[in-house]
Amino acid sequence: MAKEMSRRTFLKQGAAAAIGLAVVPSTVLGKKFGYTAPSDKLNILGVGVGGRGASVLKGLESQNIIGLCDVDWKYADHIFKRYPAAKKFNDYRKMYDEMLKSADAVMVATADHTHAIIAADAITAGKHVYCEKPLTHTVYESRLLTKLADKYKVCLLYTSP
């Protein structure tokens, strides 16, 4: 019988794993021999980048922003211009189909009622997820995302400004 993990334990272990990945020195993985450590830069996909997502992406500029998705291209145009190398989409499912395999993590800042499904799709693909609040609308959805993150061994982080 598997031991249940408390929310506190999950958050501690997830934070420790994220910090551990962020601080692995390049020399451990052989950068001087031409190999770039995975911790040097992450490939990030952004979903919902026109509003709050724009501010979140600003904090991720040191990473590789490889794909951007927003349903309102007029509203998100300034973000598309800020990251000209990123591929643009208006449907996160199309972006996931095309780019999720090459991504390390996904940033979700869409309308509140869409967070859970967009995050779940990324988690089941084995990608780490940063999500704006609220993470979900129900306790059931929250528990489901927590179980998925545990099953797929990824970090699921949500914050509020």
Predicted regions: what they are:
Residues 86-144:
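Beta-loop-alpha module in the N-terminal Rossmann-like domain of NAD(P)-dependent dehydrogenases
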Residues 41-42, 63-64, 85, 102-105, ...:
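Loop/turn elements at helix/coil->beta-strand transitions in domains of secreted/extracellular proteins
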Residues 2-18:
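N-terminal secretory signal peptides and thylakoid transit peptides that target proteins
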Residues 158-161:
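Conserved small/polar residues in nucleotide/adenosyl-binding loops
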Residues 17-83:
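N-terminal Rossmann-like dinucleotide-binding module
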